[in-house]
């Protein structure tokens, strides 16, 4: 019998490119190793916590991935899993193309900023952030990519099918070559947009934090250029 809750911690490795000790391949490596671990592969950087190695849970079909500032509202996990399990959304992986060609291995819900109120909010958040909170009259949003091409853009916070996601991304990316992995993963694993399910996240508290985040995103997008033009 496995535990209901697991604490997984990865050991740090020295990265010559970054000149620092860090988790292998950051968040992309974390998900890659998690998928391998869930399928029984022992060769990962996950460490024993408290002297006991975590027991691998059996039969895990989906993984919901969130950032530290992301909030999962009540019943959202049930809605995400139910939508993934719908027969029309089930992913079909093509071994020849090495990607998902039908259905979706990833579903991206709508990301809504927290309401910038309370003692922790700032004037910058109230001025710059978009409309926050729950819209009681809102319905599913329209999205150009989803409406025209039946695919959405993965933003790194959502649910994915472990088997299809791992098969589509296996051996695709060399080390130290990709910072913004979300869009890349959404292309090969085929992401769908689920706009009638909300996740909430905190907007940057000041301009400096927001600028650093935007700079990181732009750097990551430029690193996708070799795959766009066919160099990779």
Identify the residue ranges that each predicted region occupies.
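Internal catalytic domains of large membrane-associated glycosyltransferases
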Residues: 1-232
